[in-house]
Amino acid sequence: MRSSAWALSLACLLALVLTGCTLNTTAAPTAEAGAAISGIVHGGQNPIIGAHVYLFAANAGVFTPNTNGYGNASVSLLTAGTGRTQDTTPSDPTYLDYYVTTDSNGNFSITGDYSCTAGQQVYLYALGGNPGLGTGTNPAAGLMAALGNCPGGTSAFATGTPFVFMNEVSTVAAAYAFAGFATDAVHVSSSGTPAAKLGIANAFVNAQVLQTSGVANAAIPPLTAGSGGGDAPQAEVNTLGNILAACVNSNGTGSACTTLFANAESGGTTGNPPADTATAAINIAHNPVAAVGTLYGLSMANAQFSPTLMGQPNDFTMSIYYDNSLFNDFGALAIDANDDVWFATDYVFKLNGQGYDLTGYNGYSGFNNPYNIAIDVNGNAWALNSSAVGKFSNSGTLLSPTNGYNGLGLSTPVSIAMDASSNAWIGNYGGGNVVKVSSTGTLSGTFTGSGLSAPGPVAIDSSGDAWIADESSGAIVKLSNAGVAQSGSTGYTAAVLSTPTGIAIDHSGNVWVSNSGGTNGSVVEISSTGGLVSSSTGYTNSALGNPGAIAIDGAGNAWVADPNTISEISPTGTFLSGSTGFTVSNGYNSIGIDGSGDVVLNYDVYNFQYTNPFYYMQVMVGAATPVVTPVSLAAKNNTLGTTP
């Protein structure tokens, strides 16, 4: 009964996301009566007796530019009532919050006499209790379970009383899913803007994809005809669950807890130590390369969950792989304001953040063989093929002629970016110039200033200027919105730049360029006026071999795709991904970051048993800081590289 009740709730949640989420800026939040919730709290395989179970909602604070409400305390939903107790210990993170207590079998029950706001994201947090000790309790035992949308009214949980299984697996799933919005277990928040609400709602769905009823999922089954299945990181979730269990199943004072807390601090091995295992899980998600060997060793002592990783991983990033048999290839990707992911892959396809196909069996048709794509400020998708650009509405209607907008010598265009007026800027490699296409399809240009001869990647800054990496000279060319060169006669250069392969712009207006030329790859940072922010040799380490596409997250960190690794670089040039990068599968040629803080990648991999490759969308769950999407809208509103 436990599994079926929770599975029903999960099915309802996933049904909501199959059609894609849509931003709603007009609906006013309404308070709803809460639904009754029951469940059980386990440490490993043992019930935890006397645990305090709190019901929290993520805080959607008042929007303030550049602060955005992130870091605010979660909202406690329980109030005084029968069976509820108030925490009166001032030093507790839950001071003055109300809780219910688990019984001798670890069971708890929350009646429906509370309220929450439609669209609020709700989670359970259990603290303390006896995990099977002879006497005493473990105050360091913290567990979580993400419920999702406010469990009342017309929400997914309104049809019945959900039974929630809380353990280390549900904790890991919750910690990674909403890592981009969490400071610790009792500080989960966002700005409350429509984009932020959408991002955190999608994040909570990821928690259900990772686990069901406290059991790590191995596969993501397709729920509709044509939707992709996929593989969940079951072994990694279980391994991380075992790391937490070593501390949870103790009195909180032994080496399992002290080792965990010393190596899962707010900065990894530095910063503030966690007060409990739930916050430790969030800190591991925030610092996935910190003390990996030490933490992995904790999982070996008394494994409670299986299967597990066969050996020590390179890092503790967590990825879901969504496959889709409809794809013939994976071209570039772009993310729209609904956090849906668009792919140009012979046809135009749109998937939601959980990998489900939103386009139908043949994708959006009418424009043949596209391989690159960008989203304009109105949500329309612009796709490139070898001689034209096609325009689709957000619902997939072809808005351009069947053959697209063409002319002005468009030949083998390789890149596209959108400005604030929904003009498309195209790197026309075969023509050796840049072509600008208006929102109605009028072509202008061709632009060849600053010695531009082999245009590669293109990006638009918040002033409307276009930045183009020249793949022949290695120079970075800046054009005004009218197409006038702003970067001298030869463009901006750096000693290391020879084969620029990716370009992105942060909130300060600095331009990040990935460079695959030379013995080792590098990333060069240039100011808005063309001066070097990085050294002339760029940011380098052993992880950068052949860097390509690049994206900026909401903290201003640059994420760089390499064939076998992903690198994360801070605004000051520190490699947050360590000396070897985050290990991923091979074949990446595009990268994006969504409003949930997920890093989205495309890749193909050949299997020796098959002639044809498999194509996947990889989602690194909660790895980045949530960011405003699409990039064109962020550029228009001067919110590039900021949180929603």
Predicted regions and their residues:
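Extended surface/linker regions that mediate inter-domain or inter-protein docking
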Residues: 199-327
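C-terminal motif of bacterial Sec signal peptides marking the signal peptidase cleavage site
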Residues: 17-20
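A structural detector for beta-sheet-dominated domains
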Residues: 42, 56, 103, 111-113, ...
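Flexible "stalk/tail and boundary" regions
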Residues: 291-644
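Bacterial N-terminal signal peptides that target proteins for export
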Residues: 1-10
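Beta-strand-dominated extracellular/periplasmic modules and repeats
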Residues: 23-151
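A non-transmembrane, solvent-exposed segment enriched in polar/low-complexity residues
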Residues: 70, 79, 83-88, 109-228
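Cleavable N-terminal targeting peptides that direct proteins into the secretory/outer-membrane pathway or into
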Residues: 12-14
